[in-house]
Amino acid sequence: MFTANMNIQDYDPILWQAIENENRRQEEHIELIASENYASPRVMQAQGSQFTNKYAEGYPGKRYYGGCEYADIVEQLAIDRAKQLFGADYVNVQPHSGSQANAAVYGALIQPNDTILGMDLAHGGHLTHGAKVSFSGKIYNSVLYGITAEGLIDYEDVRQKALECKPKMIVAGFSAYSQIVDWAKMREIADEVGAYLFVDMAHVAGLIAAGVYPSPLPYAHVVTTTTHKTLGGPRGGLILSACGDEEIYKKLQSSVFPANQGGPLVHIIAAKAVCFKEALEPEYKIYQQNVVKNAKAMVEVFKQRGYEVISNGTENHLFLVSFVKQGLTGKAADAALGQANITVNKNSVPNDPQKPFITSGIRIGTPAVTRRGFKEADVQALAGWMCDVLDSIGKDNHEQVIAETKAKVLDICARLPVYAK
């Protein structure tokens, strides 16, 4: 029997210390990784619920195990809320991750060795959009499109590649693209070559849910997303569609279970249901509007300080800063900012002269800082501090600038905690 006073702190102090240290790191560091966000206490409560004990292979009303009546309620809640949130008529909430959601889509609609056309990872795409090191580039014949020197998708280039390679599927979506994707144009190209249009909206799902970024649902045959990132929920995946094709829906359903996964994570599905309810609240739209405002405000500071922003701006939650002109590496910038308690990630830029583990840029995103309460004035100050650190790399005053910046970071983090005591 489990007793009420059982806890990790007493039983496993080494693990508990790691958890406590991570909590302190999140509270005392400014999080600017574009794919990270803070889940609400309600989401975390659902993740820690007794549903973690429940096996529920199958779908609501069609389970292979008994005792699933409450799991059915939870999963149906998540499905119905996601449909309402995104305007979908098909939803699968079972994928354990975005990558597994993507694998299920490929498995449902195309065959091994079929050709897919996706965005190059080095130009802002994702591993699962056809990168050679990913299953998507090993199982399928992947052809890649990129962005122009100005940092924009060249739709005529996408069209020409599609006409040449005749893909069975065109993959749209990104992990590091800061502009609006023309979903209608991508569908037009897909229709011209008889391909499915598959959109991975993982990075902008929260913005789309709030109506501050165009939705791909009216254009794509199928859409996937993660449920963290801008959505701000638990780590997991989601498949949606509004194409109206029941045959596609059946294929997607069986491609998740039993083809790619066994039992769903009911506790995570419960957390997804909470996340979707939160995203339907009026204040959620204000939050997402502020995410974009904050990203735009930071961009202007970097440009004023002489740093190149890829595509010269942003229309979403993220942007890339290139250091090619400064001769600085993304790895060095990432490390220096990290010393000042500012967390970013190094990122390749178009035509990057550096290797992927070094890079010539960083990716910056505003979902997490906005969720903890940063306003435009706060992120403008923050961007200035970041430029101070970057300007000082290799100079005599570098350590002093790091120390001064870290003190400012600790002060604002104390004033704007993630989880209020």
From Swiss-Prot:
Pathway: One-carbon metabolism; tetrahydrofolate interconversion; Amino-acid biosynthesis; glycine biosynthesis; glycine from L-serine: step 1/1. Gene3D superfamilies: Aspartate Aminotransferase, domain 1, Type I PLP-dependent aspartate aminotransferase-like (Major domain). The record marks 228 as: Plays an important role in substrate specificity. One of its GO terms (biological process) is tetrahydrofolate interconversion. InterPro entries: PyrdxlP-dep_Trfase (IPR015424), PyrdxlP-dep_Trfase_major (IPR015421), PyrdxlP-dep_Trfase_small (IPR015422), Ser_HO-MeTrfase (IPR001085), Ser_HO-MeTrfase-like (IPR049943), Ser_HO-MeTrfase_PLP_BS (IPR019798), SHMT-like_dom (IPR039429). Its main location: cytoplasm. (6S)-5,6,7,8-tetrahydrofolate binds at residues 121, 125-127. GO terms for cellular component: cytosol. The keyword Transferase applies. It catalyses: (6R)-5,10-methylene-5,6,7,8-tetrahydrofolate + glycine + H2O = (6S)-5,6,7,8-tetrahydrofolate + L-serine. GO terms for molecular function: glycine hydroxymethyltransferase activity; pyridoxal phosphate binding. The modification N6-(pyridoxal phosphate)lysine is found at residue 229. Keywords: Amino-acid biosynthesis, Cytoplasm, One-carbon metabolism, Pyridoxal phosphate, Transferase. Its EC number is 2.1.2.1. It is an enzyme of class 2 (transferase). Disulfide bonds: none annotated. Homodimer. Catalyzes the reversible interconversion of serine and glycine with tetrahydrofolate (THF) serving as the one-carbon carrier. This reaction serves as the major source of one-carbon groups required for the biosynthesis of purines, thymidylate, methionine, and other important biomolecules. Also exhibits THF-independent aldolase activity toward beta-hydroxyamino acids, producing glycine and aldehydes, via a retro-aldol mechanism. NCBIfam families: PRK00011.1. Belongs to the SHMT family. This is Serine hydroxymethyltransferase. It comes from Actinobacillus pleuropneumoniae serotype 3 (strain JL03).
